[in-house]
Amino acid sequence: MKKVEMFTDGACSGNPGPGGWGCILRYKNQEKELSGGESETTNNRMEMTAVIKGLQHLKESCYVLLSTDSKYVLDGVTKYMPLWLANDWRKSNKKPVLNVDLWKMLNQELEKHQVEWIWVKGHAGHPENERVDSLACQERDKFKS
């Protein structure tokens, strides 16, 4: 199984507002940068989209070391998703999970890969995190008037 490093970030102005996402995939000495954006979105949706797009880009099942500064994504996957799945995508208060469309897509992608989650502090000089933040901000800025 190939071992891939993935670094992701999302950015948004206004929340909701224009947003962007960035992802770096690294396999051995090869790197691929991915990015995109939306005119009306939230920071959490962009953080999730970065992870989904990165995982979708992988052509085969991989062992993924996934670094993110998003506690929303990290905690959602590692703490809450098993409960949401058991409760038909509802929280403990019976209300629907926010961003359920993206959580379902993320769950589908996670089933294809073995993912080890790594939290990194954002805006703290981590080179890859700074780069994906820059990619996300560049994409976000394309939608700003």
Q: For the regions a protein language model found, what residue spans apply to each?
A:
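RNase H catalytic domain
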Residues: 8-18, 52-131, 135, 140-142
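Short beta-strand scaffold segments in enzyme catalytic cores
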Residues: 21-27
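Extreme N-terminal starter segment of soluble prokaryotic enzymes
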Residues: 2-5
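A short, polar/acidic, helix/strand-boundary loop motif
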Residues: 28-46, 57
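Metal-dependent nuclease catalytic cores that hydrolyze phosphodiester bonds in DNA/RNA
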Residues: 145
